[in-house]
Amino acid sequence: MLTGVMNELSAARTDAQAPAWRHLPALQQPAYPDEAALADVVADLRRRPPLVFAGEVDSLRNLIAQASTGDAFVLMGGDCAESFTHNTADNIRLKVQTILQMAAVLTYGASTPVVKIGRMAGQYAKPRSSDTETRGEVTLPAFRGDSVNGHEFTPEARIPDPTRMLDAYLRSGTTLNLIRAFTMGGYADLREVHSWNRGFTANPAYKRFESFAEELDRAMRFMEAAGVDFEALRQVDFYAAHEALLLEYEDAMIREDSRSGRLYDTSAHMLWVGERTREADGAHVAILAGVHNPVGVKVGPTTSSDDLSRLMDRLNPEGLPGRLSLITRMGAERIREALPPLVEAVRADGRPVTWIADPMHGNTITSDNGYKTRRFETILDEIRGFFEVHRTLGTAPGGIHVELTGDDVTEVLGGGEHIDEAGLAEHYETLVDPRLNHQQSLEVAFEIAEMLKG
């Protein structure tokens, strides 16, 4: 992550830049009971400093452009929904460590740079399939993330509270500061990251990765013998991204770059719109169309080629490399059938995109004992399908987007630890969707590294 200059960005916007999204359909927005309180919070956010800087955002866009041609690989990972309660230094450190470990393995497998993006420092809002939640005979507003309302199933907690956006802003800033400290202060030392991975492969459950780890060992010894300056490898660039869901918050964080006059959403380096909010004529696409950040769109199995054409027209009409990523979430059973016509249509269009696989959201199931979960092997199967499609068509598999944690939770079935349905109850902690735990995340990285080598 680069060091930004604070005075690059100003809160001022001209009348010509007034948000057009307010006149468009805005799905998945909370109904705040106190509009005056909402207006006060938005005004407060507009006066606050940016969380990220234009130079950092531009650097990320250039890296994502490299991934679109196979000259880099994007790794996006983090919580389904961040929690105010779990926004601790230890939890942040463990997530960063997990992503750094995955990146080291992927870098060796791909023989290209890995672009590290945390689904962190802002992932506090979540879309929901229903506006309400019913338990027994009680129905309350759905939990929409800590930046909107509380998770507790009480009438008071579930009332949307705009002051939570201020809390989200402050916690996002704290997270970014810690990420900068960890990744720029020696914590990301390649030798240290490699030693963590050796600890992983020493586990008999992951013995099949031992030969890969030995290759990495030889590469490290060669680098040392060749006089590589490991001190120069103690720092890495690490970026932050989240879903642009809560429109009042995102709009309040838009700033103008004094160098270029361009607008940036300074709540994150990269933002994406989800499957539920990706309408080309909707408010979420409109707000991202007006900023210069790299953006992503979640693409499910019902997406048509015409849908993608309209989204490219709205979000990247000029065809700028690195501007638009298409994050596919097809489901393992459908990706080999649904993805090829979309890839072919985009290639025929000619405007560059970066293809990123989300193997999580299309593979969610409910276990027999009532837990929302995913199967590890199904997640891997969707990743394999993603690579197979791109290899067959001669296009670049640009990256992976996974929900993960650095903790030893038990939320995803299977993997080397053989988590079964009975084991889900041991450490099931997610607020919304199930995440890969630390060991499962590394297992995914080793599997993808083998695919990248092949």
Model-derived segments and their meaning:
Residues 323-355, 361-410:
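Non-transmembrane, aqueous-exposed alpha-helical and coiled segments at domain scale
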Residues 2-149:
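Long, contiguous, compositionally biased segments that the model treats as domain-scale units
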Residues 59-61, 281-284, 311, 340-342:
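Glycine-rich, charged/polar anion/phosphate-binding loops
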Residues 36-43, 47, 221, 348, ...:
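Polar/charged alpha-helical tracts
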Residues 81-82, 86-331, 374, 399-401, ...:
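Active-site-facing alpha/beta catalytic cores
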